[in-house]
């Protein structure tokens, strides 16, 4: 089992943990359809930034 050489201070521990926080997903509302989707992703209807970029039946 690993044993530490020197005790880490509370400050060092907290500075290490400062990057561990989770953030919520950034969601956007499509202007034309009103659908909610992830930022910089195509909506389920195939619309991105107000333009139809993917035909719904194309992937089938």
Curated annotation (Swiss-Prot):
Name of the protein this chain belongs to: Large ribosomal subunit protein bL32
GO cellular component: large ribosomal subunit
GO biological process: translation
Entry-linked PANTHER family: 50S RIBOSOMAL PROTEIN L32 (PTHR35534), LARGE RIBOSOMAL SUBUNIT PROTEIN BL32 (PTHR35534:SF1)
UniProt keyword tRNA-binding present: no
HAMAP family hit by this protein: Ribosomal_bL32
Bias (Basic and acidic residues) ranges: 11-22
A Pfam match: Ribosomal_L32p
SUPFAM superfamilies: Zn-binding ribosomal proteins (SSF57829)
UniProt-recorded Gene Ontology molecular function terms: structural constituent of ribosome
Region (Disordered): 1-60
Family membership: Belongs to the bacterial ribosomal protein bL32 family.
Swiss-Prot/TrEMBL keywords: Ribonucleoprotein, Ribosomal protein
């Amino acid at each position: 089992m690993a044993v530490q050489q020197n005790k880490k201070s509370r400050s060092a521990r907290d500075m290490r943990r400062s990057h561990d926080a989770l953030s919520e997903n950034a969601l956007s509302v499509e202007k034309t359809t009103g659908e909610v989707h992830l930022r910089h992703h195509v909506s389920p209807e195939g619309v991105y930034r107000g333009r139809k970029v993917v035909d719904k039946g194309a992937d089938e």
